[in-house]
Amino acid sequence: MSVQSKEVTNDKGQQYHICCSKEDIGRYVLLPGDPFRTDIIARHLENAKLVAHNREHKTWTGTLNGEKVTVCSTGMGCPSTAIALEELIHCGADTFIRVGTCGRVCPESYNEDLEGVIITGAVRDEGTTVHYVPIEYPAIADRHVIDALAKACNDKGYNFAEGIAQSKDSFYGQHDPDSMPNSGRLHQRWEAWEKSRVMASEMETAALFIVSSIRGARAGAIMAYGSMNDHTIELACDAIKVLIERDKE
Ligand SMILES: O=P(O)(O)O[C@H]1O[C@H](CO)[C@@H](O)[C@H]1O
Ligand SMILES: O=c1cc[nH]c(=O)[nH]1
């Protein structure tokens, strides 16, 4: 039996950061980092309505296959992602797909034909999730969500790999480690991720997987290499439809 966090509300009784209430949020949620990306993803929903926009969290709710589906931006990094997750779970959400962008890491990921990655697990190279549970606990995706993403990808014939993401706290620690006094440690660890077949580097998935596991929710992630593309958004929406249909069975 999973335990929810205590609700913290604003003066309207809404969740403190996302400024939403239970009736605003669907069971199924798409999670981009960027608030502007929510507008693009919301166009894939039927009857999408803007519910709230507070700080980095912009939230739309509409339907897919007749079920209520929400799009909510997490902002950049694990702290704001964990906050969004907790508050969406307070509102009754239990199924999450991150729709993000990422960088390439291991040699295999540098195959230019690959559009992106369906994430199966995340390296907890960040500071948020140790506030939840010791580092030995794995950050893994829900197998039903991975399978729904894999089915969507197979049906469309798009070229996505499956693999592990590194969730880090410093974008410039990845892109310019030599400018950091801590460069030795950054290089050593990056080499370890390259040698251990890490397929993607990004900043939110570890928090998504850890908070979801601990709170008893299901989560997965699909990420585009470089900038966001239509295929990644399409597959995330298709996977939500697969889960909706399978949940009815
Ligand atoms: O495209 P999003 O979802 O923001 O994800 C990636 O892009 C940002 C860095 O540019 C980080 O948030 C990283 O995880
Ligand atoms: O290289 C990249 C691209 C997106 N997001 C990251 O964190 N790194």
Predicted segments, located by residue:
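A C-terminal functional module that forms or caps the active site or interfaces directly
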Residues: H187-G220
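Metabolite-binding pocket within alpha/beta catalytic cores that recognizes anionic/polar moieties
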Residues: M1-A148
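Active-site rim beta-loop-alpha module in soluble metabolic enzymes
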Residues: E136-K195
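Glycine-rich phosphate/pyrophosphate-binding loops
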Residues: V99, R215-S227
